[in-house]
Amino acid sequence: MRLSVAAAISHGRVFRRMGLGPESRIHLLRNLLTGLVRHERIEAPWARVDEMRGYAEKLIDYGKLGDTNERAMRMADFWLTEKDLIPKLFQVLAPRYKDQTGGYTRMLQIPNRSLDRAKMAVIEYKGNCLPPLPLPRRDSHLTLLNQLLQGLRQDLRQSQEASNHSSHTAQTPGI
């Protein structure tokens, strides 16, 4: 028997649809990438940020090739809708990551959007000049697992105290 995750079964789809069609998806990704390069930190729904992350990383890889590389210039020209950001890609972002081979972005989940409860995320380029985001604590005492463990410990402590009390009264004879 083979266990598989339902999300891994794509039936020919290799990316999220995110919109009306393939052209709409590309326009959405281009606008998100442009915003990320301009502001170096944006927030959007989790699915869009997760889909855009690979393109943001690849754009930095092309930026590291330099503005004299024809393919890098074509990719920057295509993906950045605001052409004044092309020099920023080649002269600011690419030199920042010249010693890294990947992992240029950080993605954090933030509270859900209040209107439709959509799962939201923040994506940012690492090493930006913005104040750092607070990293979520993984092992909070409020998680379900930690609450269950705390209850188990209390039950064990109570049963040990009860058994100690009953064994203590059994050993001491009554007067």
From Swiss-Prot:
Where in or outside the cell it occurs: the entry states:
Mitochondrion
Q: Which tissues does it occur in?
A: Detected in adrenal gland, mammary gland and adipose tissue.
Pfam families reported in the protein's UniProt record? Ribosomal_L17 (PF01196)
Keywords, comma-separated and alphabetical: Mitochondrion, Ribonucleoprotein, Ribosomal protein, Transit peptide
State any GO BP term from the record: mitochondrial translation
Renumbered to this chain, region (Disordered) spans 155-175
Classification via InterPro entries? Ribosomal_bL17 (IPR000456), Ribosomal_bL17_sf (IPR036373)
* Feature: compositional bias, Polar residues: 161-175
UniProt GO MF annotations: protein domain specific binding; structural constituent of ribosome
| Residue interval of the organelle targeting sequence | 1-8
Q: Which domain of life is it from?
A: Eukaryota
**CC annotations in GO:** mitochondrial inner membrane; mitochondrial large ribosomal subunit; mitochondrion
Which family is annotated?
Belongs to the bacterial ribosomal protein bL17 family.
Its subunit composition reads: Component of the mitochondrial large ribosomal subunit (mt-LSU). Mature mammalian 55S mitochondrial ribosomes consist of a small (28S) and a large (39S) subunit. The 28S small subunit contains a 12S ribosomal RNA (12S mt-rRNA) and 30 different proteins. The 39S large subunit contains a 16S rRNA (16S mt-rRNA), a copy of mitochondrial valine transfer RNA (mt-tRNA(Val)), which plays an integral structural role, and 52 different proteins.
Q: Which PANTHER family match?
A: LARGE RIBOSOMAL SUBUNIT PROTEIN BL17M (PTHR14413:SF16), RIBOSOMAL PROTEIN L17 (PTHR14413)
NCBIfam families named among the record's database cross-references? L17 (TIGR00059)
Protein name (Swiss-Prot/TrEMBL)? Large ribosomal subunit protein bL17m
Q: Which organism is it from?
A: Homo sapiens
